[in-house]
C-alpha cells in the first residue's frame, strides 16, 4: 500500500515536473564574428548556478551550456581580450573585472550589449530581452527553439553594427587599431547628466524622455531597450520551455524575423480561407497604395522641376552659371581648396573680371538638395562685412555649384591651432570675436528673414586679406519666418563640440537662435585656450582630465588669472582676455534662456569690463570618458584641445571650410 502510494506520488511529481516546464534548458552559444569572443554570464538567483561563468569561443565555434530551472541572469560577449605577463586576463569591451576568463559572478563593464533572462517565471513563462542601455559592443540575436506544438516565440536582438554609426564623441577606440571603434558608449556613461541617466528629478518615466543618442540606438535596434525607461514591450515572453540559440555577429537580419505559426491541424484548415481573404484584400490595398504613391511622386517631381528651373533663380536673384562655365573658371577643377561632407571646394577665377573666387561643387544627392537650397536661399538674403558674399550658382539637374568670394587667409582654425608657431595677439582675437558676433547678430535680427546658422565653428569662419572674420557655410542653416523664436527640428544639426545641449535633448529647453549663441561661446573659449595652450597643458595633474571651460571658470572664480592668461600679459591685454572669458561663459549657459542674445553679446564685448557680472557655472558636469584598462593607449581623452573633442565632421555631413590651401577636415 505504501509502495503503491510512493509510486503514485513519484509519478505525479514527475508529471508535474514536465508539464509545468520546470526543467533544465540548453543555451547554444555561437560565434560568427571574424574574431574570438569570450561569452560571460552573471547569475542573479542565489539558489542556482551555471556550470561556467565565462569561456572562449573562437571564430565559427559554438558551445552548449546546460542552464538549470528558474535561472535568472544575464549574458554578454567580451572582445579583444588578452592575458598580461603577470597572468591577469582582461578585455577591451565587456570586461567583468575578475582577472580571469571566468567572471566570478561579476557583471560587464559598459559599454556592452546585454541579454537578460528569467526562466520559469509567471505561469511558467520565460522572460528575455536585449539591452543597449549600457552601451553596445557586439551584434547579437536570441532565437528560441520551440519544443512541441504551440506558437513560435519571437527572436530578439541587435544585429546592426552600431559601432559604425556611433556618434564620434561616444566611440571607444581600440589600442591597436585606432581607426575603427570597438564599442559605443551610452550618453549617461559619457556625460553623466541626469537627463541622460534618468536619475534625480529625471528619475520618473514621464520626466526622462528619449534623447538623440537613445533614439539613434532605437532606430538601429528597435527590439532592444535603448534607455532606462524604454517601452516595456521590449521584454519578450515564451512558454513551452524552449532551448535558446544565442549568436554573436549573426550573418543576416533574416534571423530577426518573428514567425508565429499554429501547428494544430484543425486550426490550419480553419484558417486557410482566412489566409486567402487576407491575401486578396492585401493585394487590392497594395495596388491602391502603389497608384497613390505614383501620383504623389509624379506631382512632387513636377513641383521639383518647376523649382529647379524657375524658383531657385527667382529666390536667389543671383547670376546663374552653366556647368561648362564653372568648369572653365576652375581650370577643370585643378586647384582644390578643401573637401567636406557636402562636396569639394576649388579655387577659380571669373572670366569677365579676373576676380578670384571659391567654387563649391556639391556631391550628387538624392531629393531636392536641401543643403544647396539652404545655402543659396540663406546667403542670397545677406549683405554684411562679416558674412561671406555669394556671387552666383550653377543648377543643372544633379550638377550644383555655389560661387563665393575667395578668402586668401583660410579659416580661423588655422590661426588658433595648437600647431601654429605664432598665435594671434589678444587685440586681434578680440577683433575676431567682435566680428563674428556682429555677423551672427545680423543673421538673427537684421535680415528680412531670421537665419539661424546651426554650424558655427572655427572651420566655418573665414579670414580675408585683412584678417577680418566672415561667417560661411550655410548648408545647415534654417530660415525662420517672422523671426520666430522657437524652431521645430526633425534632426540635430551642427558639429559635435559646438552643438548646444538643447539640440541633444529637449530636457534642456527649446531650440532657437540661442543655439548659435552657445556655439559662438565655444568658439571664443577655443580661441582663448589655443592662445594659452602651454599653460593649460602644464596646469598640473589635478586638472589634467578637467574639461577646459570648467577649468577656466574655477580659476577665474578663484582669481588665479595667471594660470589662464600667463605671466607676460599686459594690463590692457588682461582686460580683453577677462572680457572674452566672461562673455564666452555667459554664452555657454546650459539653459538657453540664460544666454544673452547676440546684440547683448556685442554690448558686453564693446562695453566696460567693470559692468560685466560673473555668470553662474555653466557646466553641470565634466564630460570625462571611461576607457577600459586595456585601452590606455587610446587617443580618446577628455581634454578640451584634443581633436577628438571638437570633431571635424558634422552630424549631417556638413561642408568643411572654404579655405586657401588644400586641407581636408
Swiss-Prot record:
Expressed in roots. Expressed at low levels in stems. It is an enzyme of class 2 (transferase). The chain crosses the membrane at residues 277-297. The keyword Lipid metabolism does not apply. Its EC number is 2.7.11.1. Changing residue 360 to R: Loss of kinase activity. It is found in: Membrane. CDD domains: TLP-PA. Residues 331-620 form the Protein kinase domain. InterPro entries: Kinase-like_dom_sf, LRK10/LRL21-25-like, Osmotin/thaumatin-like_sf, Prot_kinase_dom, Protein_kinase_ATP_BS, Ser/Thr_kinase_AS, Thaumatin, Thaumatin_CS. Autophosphorylated in vitro. Pfam families: Pkinase, Thaumatin. Keywords: ATP-binding, Disulfide bond, Glycoprotein, Kinase, Membrane, Nucleotide-binding, Serine/threonine-protein kinase, Signal, Transferase, Transmembrane, Transmembrane helix. Residues 298-665 are cytoplasmic. It catalyses: L-seryl-[protein] + ATP = O-phospho-L-seryl-[protein] + ADP + H(+); L-threonyl-[protein] + ATP = O-phospho-L-threonyl-[protein] + ADP + H(+). Its main location: membrane. One of its GO terms (biological process) is response to fungus. Glycans are attached at residues 26, 88, 163, 233. PANTHER family: RUST RESISTANCE KINASE LR10-RELATED (PTHR27009). In the N-terminal section; belongs to the thaumatin family. In the C-terminal section; belongs to the protein kinase superfamily. Ser/Thr protein kinase family. Possesses kinase activity in vitro. This is PR5-like receptor kinase. It comes from Arabidopsis thaliana.
Amino acid at each position: 500500500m505504501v509502495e503503491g502510494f510512493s509510486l503514485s506520488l513519484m509519478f505525479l511529481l514527475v508529471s508535474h515536473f514536465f508539464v509545468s516546464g520546470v526543467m533544465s534548458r540548453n543555451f547554444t552559444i555561437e560565434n560568427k564574428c571574424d574574431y574570438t569572443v569570450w561569452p560571460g554570464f552573471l547569475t542573479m538567483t542565489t539558489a542556482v548556478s551555471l556550470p561556467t561563468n565565462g569561456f572562449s569561443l573562437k571564430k565559427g565555434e559554438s558551445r552548449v551550456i546546460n542552464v538549470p530551472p528558474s535561472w535568472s541572469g544575464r549574458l554578454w560577449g567580451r572582445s579583444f581580450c588578452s592575458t598580461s605577463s603577470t597572468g591577469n586576463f582582461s578585455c577591451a569591451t565587456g570586461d567583468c573585472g575578475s582577472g580571469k576568463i571566468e567572471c566570478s559572478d561579476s557583471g560587464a563593464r559598459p559599454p556592452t550589449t546585454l541579454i537578460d533572462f528569467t526562466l520559469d517565471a509567471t505561469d511558467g513563462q520565460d522572460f528575455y530581452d536585449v539591452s543597449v542601455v549600457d552601451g553596445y559592443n557586439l551584434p547579437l540575436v536570441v532565437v528560441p527553439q520551440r519544443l512541441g506544438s504551440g506558437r513560435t516565440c519571437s527572436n530578439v536582438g541587435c544585429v546592426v553594427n552600431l559601432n559604425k554609426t556611433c556618434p564620434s564623441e561616444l566611440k571607444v577606440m581600440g589600442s591597436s587599431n585606432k581607426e575603427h571603434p570597438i564599442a559605443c558608449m551610452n550618453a549617461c556613461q559619457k556625460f553623466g547628466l541626469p537627463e541622460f541617466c534618468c536619475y534625480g528629478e529625471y528619475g520618473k518615466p514621464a520626466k526622462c524622455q528619449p534623447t538623440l543618442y537613445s533614439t539613434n540606438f532605437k532606430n538601429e535596434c528597435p527590439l532592444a531597450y535603448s534607455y532606462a525607461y524604454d517601452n516595456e514591450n521590449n521584454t519578450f515572453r515564451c512558454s513551452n520551455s524552449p532551448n535558446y540559440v544565442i549568436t554573436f555577429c549573426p550573418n543576416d537580419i533574416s534571423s530577426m524575423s518573428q514567425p508565429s505559426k499554429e501547428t494544430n491541424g484543425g486550426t490550419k484548415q480553419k484558417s486557410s480561407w482566412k489566409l486567402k481573404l487576407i491575401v486578396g484584400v492585401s493585394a487590392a490595398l497594395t495596388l491602391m497604395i502603389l497608384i497613390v504613391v505614383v501620383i504623389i511622386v509624379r506631382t512632387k517631381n513636377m513641383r521639383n522641376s518647376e523649382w529647379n528651373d524657375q524658383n531657385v533663380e527667382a529666390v536667389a536673384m543671383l547670376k546663374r552659371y552653366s556647368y561648362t562655365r564653372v568648369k572653365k573658371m576652375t581650370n577643370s577643377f585643378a586647384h582644390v581648396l578643401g573637401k567636406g561632407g557636402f562636396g569639394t571646394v576649388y579655387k577659380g577665377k571669373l572670366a569677365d573680371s579676373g576676380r578670384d573666387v571659391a567654387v563649391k561643387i556639391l556631391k550628387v544627392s538624392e531629393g531636392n538638395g536641401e543643403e544647396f537650397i539652404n545655402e543659396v536661399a540663406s546667403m542670397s538674403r545677406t549683405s554684411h562685412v562679416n558674412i561671406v558674399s555669394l556671387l552666383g550658382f550653377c543648377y543643372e539637374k544633379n550638377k550644383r555649384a555655389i560661387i563665393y568670394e575667395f578668402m586668401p587667409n583660410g579659416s580661423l582654425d588655422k590661426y588658433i591651432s595648437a600647431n601654429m608657431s605664432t598665435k594671434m595677439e589678444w587685440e586681434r582675437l578680440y577683433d575676431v570675436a567682435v566680428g563674428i558676433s556682429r555677423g551672427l547678430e545680423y543673421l538673427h535680427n537684421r535680415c528680412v528673414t531670421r537665419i539661424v546658422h546651426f554650424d558655427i565653428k572655427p572651420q566655418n569662419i573665414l579670414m580675408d586679406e585683412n584678417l577680418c572674420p566672415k561667417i560661411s557655410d550655410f548648408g545647415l542653416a534654417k530660415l525662420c519666418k517672422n523671426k520666430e523664436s522657437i524652431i521645430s527640428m526633425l534632426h540635430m544639426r551642427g558639429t559635435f563640440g559646438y552643438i548646444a545641449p538643447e539640440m541633444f535633448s529637449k530636457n534642456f529647453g527649446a531650440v532657437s537662435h540661442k543655439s548659435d549663441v552657445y556655439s559662438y561661446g565655444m568658439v571664443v573659449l577655443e580661441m582663448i585656450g589655443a592662445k594659452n595652450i602651454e599653460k593649460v597643458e602644464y596646469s598640473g595633474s589635478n586638472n589634467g582630465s578637467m574639461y577646459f571651460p570648467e577649468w577656466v571658470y574655477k580659476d577665474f572664480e578663484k582669481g588665479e588669472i595667471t594660470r589662464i592668461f600667463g605671466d607676460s600679459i599686459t594690463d590692457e591685454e588682461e582686460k580683453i582676455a577677462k572680457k572674452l572669458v566672461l562673455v564666452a561663459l555667459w554664452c555657454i549657459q546650459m539653459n538657453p534662456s540664460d544666454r544673452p542674445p547676440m546684440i547683448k553679446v556685442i554690448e558686453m564685448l564693446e562695453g566696460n569690463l567693470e559692468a560685466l557680472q560673473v555668470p553662474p557655472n555653466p557646466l553641470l558636469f565634466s564630460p570625462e570618458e571611461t576607457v577600459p584598462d586595456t585601452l590606455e593607449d587610446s587617443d580618446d581623452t577628455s581634454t578640451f584641445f584634443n581633436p577628438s573633442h571638437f570633431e571635424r565632421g558634422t552630424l549631417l555631413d556638413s561642408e568643411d571650410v572654404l579655405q586657401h590651401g588644400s586641407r581636408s577636415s
